[in-house]
Amino acid sequence: MKKAGLLFLVMIVIAVVAAGIGYWKLTGEESDTLRKIVLEQCLPNQQENQNPSPCAEVKPNAGYVVLKDRHGPLQYLLMPTYRINGTESPLLTDPSTPNFFWLAWQARDFMSQKYGQPVPDRAVSLAINSRTGRTQNHFHIHISCIRPDVREQLDNNLANISSRWLPMPGGLRGHEYLARRVTESELVQRSPFMMLAEEVPEAREHMGSYGLAMVRQSDNSFVLLATQRNLLTLNRASAEEIQDHQCEILR
């Protein structure tokens, strides 16, 4: 029994190391690609030529751009026009920082424009990955379709999600998540990053270890979903895992 336990522990350690190596390979010399697109292409082109290309939209005064992602027919990214690496940035808990999740929700209309018809709100999800769950070191929120199985699970747990951060029953995609219900008025007034930092014990000191997602519910409320990195369970806190960039939910 002791040998079996030791073997299991060794396997876990190997898996954790492999996950770490994989992460560093993914975040090598190309990890600044999105930042270069925003700061060296989209922003200058908008300022000099009033043309957001290659972005779909550039709002210098509001501090963000929207870019069509190369993965998936309808996936877009919302990014700041200045340097923010990701969820670990203290700027995200500064009240003067734009409410990027609310801005990303407004940008969902780009999905409908690309699709050629309205994409139902129930099919849309927003997600940002943790520091170890991302491949780019420029803050970006994924605007894309939700996985049908995640949509069903959230629908089935509508009554179980409260206005406090509580464990999502059964987790999502094999990982533990905290879920919190928010109204639209709450979301307009306060960033989900601030809600997480201020309401979940010790979250403020470890924001970079969290991935965060947002989905609209059938009662017109929103549910925030937060997952924290735990390499022992092979969870890199990539909240993007709740999304389906091929948009099966629309078929």
UniProtKB/Swiss-Prot annotation:
Sequence intervals crossing the membrane: 4-24
Cellular compartment(s): Cell inner membrane
E.C. code: 3.6.1.26
Gene Ontology CC entries for this record: plasma membrane
Alphabetical UniProt keywords: Cell inner membrane, Cell membrane, Hydrolase, Lipid biosynthesis, Lipid metabolism, Membrane, Phospholipid biosynthesis, Phospholipid metabolism, Transmembrane, Transmembrane helix
Membrane association type: Single-pass membrane protein
One term of GO molecular function: CDP-diacylglycerol diphosphatase activity
InterPro entries in alphabetical order: CDP-diacylglyc_Pase, CDP-diacylglyc_Pase_proteobac, HIT-like_sf
Principal location: membrane
Pathway membership: Phospholipid metabolism; CDP-diacylglycerol degradation; phosphatidate from CDP-diacylglycerol: step 1/1
Listed GO biological process terms: CDP-diacylglycerol catabolic process; phospholipid biosynthetic process
Catalytic activity as recorded in UniProt: a CDP-1,2-diacyl-sn-glycerol + H2O = a 1,2-diacyl-sn-glycero-3-phosphate + CMP + 2 H(+)
EC primary class: hydrolase
Listed Gene3D superfamilies: HIT family - CDH-like
Classification via Pfam families: CDH (PF02611)
Family the UniProt entry places it in: Belongs to the Cdh family.
Entry protein name: CDP-diacylglycerol pyrophosphatase
Underlying gene: cdh
